């Protein structure tokens, strides 16, 4: 796969969690969606492939879903990790989304709690969308982040990755 990570913060970088939280809260979803859409166009141009996938973690998982709604012409598969669209003014209309969804969520998560992830799965399936949500027992938010040993779960991360690769091959290989 070819990967591209758009700079949604336009050059602002931090390793401090509090500062990162401030950046996240100030992010304009509409602008971020336009930036991601431009990244999709660039991937399509560079690879010559008409279909792309999106992966996002935490807020990025919600943004990956927003991108799939905004770009049904190109986003064929989306894999949010513990991400939901948590912005009241950004409630998506999933009816237009064509992407298959494979979500990966933690059992113990205040941001994307299991009821929210199950509600997302039900909402998508009610609309006839292909959606599968996995909730990893005993895990916490950010279980895939190996730079955070207090929450990282190697077994759950490996299991999630082993699910994502065939999922992307199924939906992105032409």
Residues covered by each model-derived region:
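N-terminal cap/leader regions of alpha/beta-hydrolase-fold enzymes
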Residues: 1-174
């Amino acid at each position: 796969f070819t990967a591209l990570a758009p700079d949604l913060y336009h050059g602002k970088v931090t390793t401090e969690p509090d500062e990162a939280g401030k950046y996240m809260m100030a992010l304009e979803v509409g602008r971020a969606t336009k930036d991601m859409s431009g990244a999709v166009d660039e991937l399509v141009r560079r690879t010559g492939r008409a279909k792309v996938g999106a992966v996002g973690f935490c807020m990025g998982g919600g943004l990956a879903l927003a991108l799939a709604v905004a770009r049904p012409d190109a986003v064929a598969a989306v894999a949010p990790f513990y991400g939901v669209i948590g912005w009241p003014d950004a409630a998506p209309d999933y009816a237009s989304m064509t992407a298959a969804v494979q979500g990966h969520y933690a059992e113990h998560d205040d941001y994307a709690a299991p009821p929210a992830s199950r509600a997302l799965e039900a909402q998508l399936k009610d609309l006839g969308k292909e959606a599968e949500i996995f909730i990893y027992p005993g895990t916490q938010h950010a279980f895939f982040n190996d730079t955070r040993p207090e929450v990282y779960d190697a077994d759950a991360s490996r299991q999630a990755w082993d699910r994502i690769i065939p999922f992307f091959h199924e939906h992105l290989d032409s």
